[in-house]
Amino acid sequence: MNKPTHDTRNGLLCALAVAAALWASYPVAEMGFIDDWSYIKTAQMFAQTGHFVYNGWAVEILGWQVLWGALFIKLFGFSFTITRLSMLPVVMATIFLLHSILRRFGVTPRNAIFGTLTFGLSPLFLPLAGSFMTDVPGVFVILLCLYLCKRAVDAGTARSTIAWLTLAAASNALGGSVRQIAWLGALVMLPSTGWLLRKRRGVLLASFFLWGISAAAIFLTMQWFSHQPYSLPEPILPPAGLNPIKHSIHLLFQLSGALLCILLMVFPILVAWLTTVRSLNSAALSKLALITATFGVFEWITSWTAPWLYHVLSAEFDPNRNGENGAAMFPGLPKWGRETISLLVVVTALILLRQLRSKLWPQLKSWAKGRTALPSPWQDILWLLGPFTVCYFLLLIPRGYRFVISDTYLLPIIPIAILCLLLLHQRWIAKPIPRISFAVLAIFALLSVAGTHD
């Protein structure tokens, strides 16, 4: 069996595994999940009238997701379950795409399967996969753009490079209508890729031409959305009159919680760094213990819930939190259980941070001064995903300043973290992921299925 066929088989198996986990959770309930009742209503109205009918709740355009859901409603009749079931092909395509991306960036076959399942079976992705929320379709559009941009990087000629970039621009400009944040693919990832490939003839000019066309299409789509009855555009900048000190402190907690939440979702990979704790000297171990203990005491005293953020994770794992209909949801984990997992996340993150400081940081400084070149996958990651990630977090800041950064907002960043951690593990520790990581993944998968079911 040749390599492409082998990778295709593994990607399909990952997609089927996530679909099987979703079916095992039996996500059947004729009621809303977070905001998807509003989106389902819009799909139902489109199936009945052929028009987009908003209801004053959604800040997302919804785009092709409404058409896709309406198709299933037309074919099988309306129900919450049927409309949510329409997302299953999108869920499986997202998982397949992620596996393909990991392989293209140089992740080994075994680790690519592990990384894909870490995302697909996570307590954040699986409940959203069983809903009609726009988060998973948004991630699909972003991953599709990343895949096409990576194909452009790997292309052998300037003509094929431009063709791949054209597909990336077209798919993102159209697909991003489901969730506006996905348009960062065409607005940021595309020109970043063009700049990386600027030495190829005509690529830089073509990429910025495609960027202009995409920006114009996005502007016209937003104009159309703003004129729809009961649409709900969300301003980027926070309103005047807010207490800057109070809200800045609030923002700091929100961003810190978001980072911890991302680390929690990649914990099956992150836990592999525990195998390196024996290489730490006594001074490093003392600092590690002090920081971890300080974090634990602070979180216990203040009842800070990070990394168990609102919406999905808090509903799954906090026994003191009620569902939006007032009924108790998944019994959750006791406080000591959540605290223990949080402390383990902090410990492994600190070990990783120490390794990044000692090994990666000198390489980045040498590259910045022009002394050395970054290895191929890291140069591609830097240009394709670096500006995208920065812009993504910049757009989260106004939300965190005013309200909260929900765990669902972090879904597109988790595949990036998975990719980077797997490559770092392969380079610095060992090629295969250790057995302890598989054990943690199995526990996470069981919790995800149970939480999604309830």
Residue ranges and their predicted role:
Residues 15-18, 282-322, 364-399:
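Transmembrane alpha-helix segments characteristic
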Residues 212-213, 287-295, 338-350, 354-389, ...:
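Signature aromatic-anchored transmembrane alpha helix within multi-pass, membrane-resident enzymes
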Residues 33-34, 127-138, 178-181, 406-407:
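Short acidic/glycine- and proline-prone juxtamembrane loop motifs at membrane-interface regions
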Residues 115-117, 161-179, 186-191, 211-217, ...:
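Membrane-interface alpha helices of multi-pass inner-membrane proteins
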Residues 191, 195-326:
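Membrane-lumen/periplasm interface segments of specific transmembrane helices
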Residues 85-106, 121, 144-148:
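Transmembrane-helix motifs of polytopic, lipid-linked glycan transferases
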Residues 103-109, 145-164, 193-199, 425:
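Membrane-interface transmembrane helices that cradle and orient dolichyl/undecaprenyl
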Residues 24-34, 48-88:
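Membrane-proximal lumenal/periplasmic loop motifs of glycosylation machinery
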